[in-house]
UniProtKB/Swiss-Prot annotation:
GO biological process assignments: chloroplast organization; translation
Cellular compartments per GO CC: cytosol; cytosolic ribosome; cytosolic small ribosomal subunit; nucleus
The gene coding this protein: RPS21B
Organismal lineage: Eukaryota, Viridiplantae, Streptophyta, Embryophyta, Tracheophyta
Keyword Ribosomal protein found: yes
GO molecular function: structural constituent of ribosome
Name of this chain's protein: Small ribosomal subunit protein eS21z
One Pfam family per UniProt: Ribosomal_S21e
Protein family: Belongs to the eukaryotic ribosomal protein eS21 family.
Coiled-coil blocks: none
Keywords: Acetylation, Ribonucleoprotein, Ribosomal protein
InterPro entries the UniProt entry points to: Ribosomal_eS21 (IPR001931), Ribosomal_eS21_CS (IPR018279), Ribosomal_eS21_sf (IPR038579)
Residues annotated with N-acetylmethionine modification: 1
Record carries keyword DNA-binding: no
Length: 82
């Protein structure tokens, strides 16, 4: 919900898992949000980052590493097309 000035006033904003598109509920204490920094050709941080959210289910199954790798490969392909 937003106030008259357009600022978000909610305490909880629901998120979706980037790997499975499942809703991350407020009681999912095993979920994580990762900010992965972008690097230039010299390996220096450019100030930009990409955010991925992983639900506890993905982490409990042991698929977090492969999920992040798959998401990052997809992100790199999208960046090359632009």
């Amino acid at each position: 919900m937003e106030n008259d000035a357009g600022q978000v006033t909610e305490l909880y904003i629901p998120r979706k898992c980037s790997a499975t598109n499942r809703m991350i509920t407020s009681k999912d204490h095993a979920s994580v949000q990762l900010n992965i920094g972008h690097l230039d050709a010299n390996g220096l941080y450019t100030g930009q980052f990409t955010t991925f959210a992983l639900c506890g289910f993905v982490r409990a199954q042991g698929d977090a590493d492969s999920g992040v790798d798959r998401l990052w490969q997809k992100k790199k392909v999208e960046a090359k097309q632009q």
